Amino acid sequence: MATPIPAKAVLEFTPRPRTLPGDGALGFWRALDEVFPGAAHQRCWVHKTANVLDKVPKSVQPAMKADLREIHGAPTRAAAEVALAVFVEKYGAKYARAADCLTKDREALLAFYDFPAEHWDHLRSSNPIESVFATVRHRTVRTKGALSATTAKLMVFKLVMAASKTWRRLKGENQLP
């Protein structure tokens, strides 16, 4: 039987990510700082949008969602900063909780602007990663207790391989290390 390779040894030989997208889970960010020190934090715009919209009445949500898209869809960081300032000016007085929710993560929300524009679509959201795990979780919960450790690993592998067939190609993949 082969001797397992410690995770720290594997990390020494793999390229370190310069940024990782994630939601507001504090454990993820602590682990990121521990395992990949120096990697930028990129907050997921899908999760942040849902969190901000949750703090306002349903009647305001469509207009606010369009204004949030103006921020993360801006062509430059400077334009995004201006759109964010306009958002705070427009909604800050009446919906302070929504404006505070957005501005408290300002740097992490705009971190993707520090990378080539071809990668922005992929860096703004952690949903593609989460959808794979949701598929695996859905199937493994249904078969709870019916699998050995080996067959569970094989099933997870096959689920991820099947899910990978529907993944979108990365834009700017030729710029990856």
Residue spans of the language-model regions?
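RNase H-like nuclease fold core
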Residues: 1-21, 26, 30-31, 35-38, ...
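Intrinsic disorder/low-complexity segments
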Residues: 3, 8-10, 40, 100, ...
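Intrinsic-disorder/low-complexity, polar/charged segments
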Residues: 3-5, 9, 44, 76, ...
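Mobile genetic element proteins and their domesticated derivatives, centered on retroelements
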Residues: 8, 20-23, 32, 47, ...
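Short, surface-exposed helix-loop/turn micro-motifs enriched in polar/charged residues
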Residues: 17-20, 41-44, 60, 79, ...
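Conserved beta-strand -> loop -> alpha-helix junction used to position metal-binding or nucleic-acid-contacting
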Residues: 20-26, 31-67
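Acidic/histidine-rich catalytic cores and adjacent linkers
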Residues: 73-177
